[in-house]
């Protein structure tokens, strides 16, 4: 899909292992809708609180927010939806939403979409289940890229790499200069997926990447082995002990000028920078590997809101979702969290930071868009296979054959199941 088509309007203006109580819904009264939130980090948590406060003032209804640590929410979502979920909850567009729609765990909100304004047809498609019905209210998106500090590149005389060879050469030079080339943390299991996605799309193309994640290509193919081999060649330039470090801790080393680069999404590094230093944060697109694919594809996940099938206050949930679909709701959120991009074409982009404007240009110029590994594939495959596989690779990068054979074996088991 063309990302330009998806966000043209905006540019203009899981198996559970923890206790069920981790994701137990709040008990709501007759005037309150409950909302399951995975926004546990300080910046988005505050921004969402402002948006919900605005809704409460406007509607004279209450929103009871049940905030759960982001990773716990992700990993326990299946049990949550089958148990006693909140009326509304935060989740993602694309395959990860479609999977739960197909399982009958989401409520159809097509009637709300008939009155929505400011969303492109392609955004609607990303919010639509396999049955052709709409389930998601999209809220914002953010691209993944290679982030760095402008002052470090200026002081050291570094050039922005366009090719993978230049990327490796830059990493070698940073290491010689006493920097950790790549700040890197994968304790939560998903951050390293962004690096895999870009390596695969740059080496094998977007179509191969999506087909692989949908179970249509073999993980033990020469193409996938090449991806892990390319990654293995970069690992000497990554922070050691990534599986014991959070992405927040990794991003802090970029802010402290101890590391030179990091592959993350737009909201992530900025949250670790002080307000005074935020203007020094910059990014460049992940470099080209195969000229046939260039830098065509961009990873730019879309986040939003869903209504659970078991919602108790259905009218309240629909009323809240209708508000969250407005430019007003997005403007309020982005005022407190300038690390994302609005999806509604009516949102106010005049106050966008230079980094937000650059992110819009990056995504608008993309020929294809991916959502993210754990959103473009089945959640059970991402959670039970790929998190462990990538972390195993980071610990033992020399057994690529054994790694991909094991992934392929588990893929066949999962994708053949109903």
Language model features with spans:
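Conserved C-terminal helix/tail region of periplasmic/extracytoplasmic solute-binding proteins
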Residues: 62, 154, 365-418
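Extracytoplasmic/periplasmic solute-binding protein
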Residues: 135-139, 144, 168-216, 259
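A structural signal for short loop-to-beta-strand junctions that line the ligand-binding cleft
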Residues: 79, 86-87, 116-151, 180-183, ...
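Glycine-centered hinge/linker elements that transmit conformational signals in sensory
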Residues: 173, 213-243
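Mature extracytoplasmic/periplasmic domains
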Residues: 106, 256, 267-271, 303-380, ...
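Extracytoplasmic/periplasmic substrate-binding proteins
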Residues: 38, 50, 96-98, 229-313
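Hinge/lid segment of periplasmic solute-binding proteins
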Residues: 92-144, 195-197, 282-284
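Conserved N-terminal structural module of periplasmic/extracytoplasmic solute-binding proteins
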Residues: 1-98, 103, 160, 243, ...
């Amino acid at each position: 899909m063309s990302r330009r088509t998806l966000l043209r309007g905006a540019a203009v203006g899981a198996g559970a292992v923890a206790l069920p109580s981790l994701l137990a819904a709040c008990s709501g009264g007759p005037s309150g809708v409950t909302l399951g939130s995975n926004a546990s980090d300080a910046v988005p948590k505050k921004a969402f609180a402002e948006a919900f406060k605005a809704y409460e003032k406007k509607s004279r209804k209450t929103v009871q927010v049940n905030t759960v640590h982001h990773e716990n929410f992700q990993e326990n979502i299946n049990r949550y939806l089958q148990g006693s979920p909140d009326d509304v909850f935060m989740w993602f567009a694309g395959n990860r939403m479609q999977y739960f729609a197909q399982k009958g765990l989401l409520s159809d909100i097509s009637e709300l979409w008939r009155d929505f304004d400011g969303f492109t047809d392609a955004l609607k498609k990303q919010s639509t289940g396999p049955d052709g019905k709409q389930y998601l209210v999209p809220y914002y998106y953010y691209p993944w890229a290679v982030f760095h500090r402008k002052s470090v590149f200026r002081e050291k005389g570094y050039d922005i790499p366009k090719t993978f060879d230049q990327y490796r050469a830059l990493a070698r030079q940073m290491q010689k200069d006493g920097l950790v080339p790549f700040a890197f943390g994968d304790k939560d299991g998903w951050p390293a997926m962004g690096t895999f996605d870009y390596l695969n799309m740059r080496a094998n193309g977007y179509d191969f990447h999506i087909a692989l994640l949908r179970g249509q290509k073999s993980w033990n193919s020469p193409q996938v082995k090449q991806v892990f081999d390319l990654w293995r060649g970069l690992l000497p330039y990554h922070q050691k002990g990534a599986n014991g470090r959070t992405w927040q801790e990794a991003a802090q080393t970029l802010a402290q000028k101890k590391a030179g680069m990091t592959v993350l999404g737009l909201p992530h590094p900025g949250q670790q920078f002080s307000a005074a230093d935020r203007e020094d944060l910059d990014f460049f697109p992940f470099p080209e590997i195969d000229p046939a694919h260039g830098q065509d594809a961009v990873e730019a996940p879309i986040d939003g809101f869903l209504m659970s099938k078991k919602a108790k206050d259905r009218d309240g949930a629909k009323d809240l979702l209708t508000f969250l679909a407005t430019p007003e709701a997005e403007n309020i959120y982005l005022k407190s969290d300038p690390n994302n991009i609005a999806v509604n074409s009516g949102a106010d982009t005049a106050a966008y930071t230079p980094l937000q404007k650059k992110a819009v240009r990056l995504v608008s110029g993309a020929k294809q868009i991916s959502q993210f590994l754990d959103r473009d594939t089945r959640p059970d495959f991402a959670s039970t296979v790929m998190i462990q596989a990538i972390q195993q690779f980071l610990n033992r990068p020399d057994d690529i054959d054994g790694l991909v054979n094991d992934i392929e074996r588990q893929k066949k088991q999962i994708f053949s199941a109903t």
